[in-house]
């Protein structure tokens, strides 16, 4: 879902046709989004895959 929105935003950036102020604004918004995603504040952080109960591979003989 996030990847889809990112691709849409990239499409919009390609269509913008080089207006400097809007490009800078877009880049600032992207940077803020990344800070929110990987910084201390994660409102929509997904559930961690680990720790999970570790199940070693046991072949069926």
Curated annotation (Swiss-Prot):
The modification Phosphoserine is found at residues 21-22. Secreted by parotid and submandibular glands. GO terms for biological process: biomineral tissue development; defense response to bacterium; regulation of bone mineralization. It is found in: Secreted. Residues 43-61 have a biased composition (Pro residues). Salivary protein that stabilizes saliva supersaturated with calcium salts by inhibiting the precipitation of calcium phosphate salts. It also modulates hydroxyapatite crystal formation on the tooth surface. This is Statherin.
